[in-house]
Regions:
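General nucleic-acid-binding
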Residues: 1-27
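A general alpha-helix detector
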Residues: 16-20, 36, 54
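Short, Lys/Arg-enriched anionic-surface-contact patches
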Residues: 33-52
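Short, amphipathic alpha-helical "recognition" segments used to contact nucleic acids or chromatin
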Residues: 49-63
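Short alpha-helical "recognition helix" segments of helix-turn-helix
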Residues: 67-73, 80
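Long, charge-dense
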Residues: 73-76, 101-103
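DNA major-groove recognition helix of helix-turn-helix
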Residues: 84-87, 91
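Short Lys/Arg-enriched helix C-cap and helix-to-coil transition segments
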Residues: 91-104
């Protein structure tokens, strides 16, 4: 029974995440997106998201070491390493897609 409950929860999480992604994609502009994110996230969550995105851009530039990024941003080397792993190794490709879109 607990396996069925856990499977249902995982499905619900995946469905809710997909609905959130679609909602974000459907917002008309950056200002509306920012308003939605401010309502949706705590200040700490928003700070973490914006820090990760900043780190992704710095890593993509390839000019700074993890320690230099840490010194410049205050973001932990653990977080920097996690962003680097998702940027370079994980199959999702979200960071890469967003960075490419910035360059286009």
């Amino acid at each position: 029974m607990t396996d069925m409950i856990e499977k249902t929860r995982q499905t619900d999480v995946a469905t809710r995440r997909a609905l959130l992604a679609q909602t974000l994609a459907d917002l008309p502009d950056a200002a509306t997106m920012e308003q939605f994110l401010i309502d949706l996230c705590t200040p700490a969550e928003l700070r973490a998201l914006s820090e990760r995105w900043h780190v992704a851009k710095l890593l993509d530039e390839g000019k700074l070491s993890y320690r230099e990024i840490n010194a410049r941003t205050g973001v932990s080397t653990t977080t920097i390493g996690r962003v680097a792993r998702f940027l370079n190794e994980e199959p999702h490709g979200g960071y890469r897609t967003a960075l490419k879109q910035l360059k286009d």
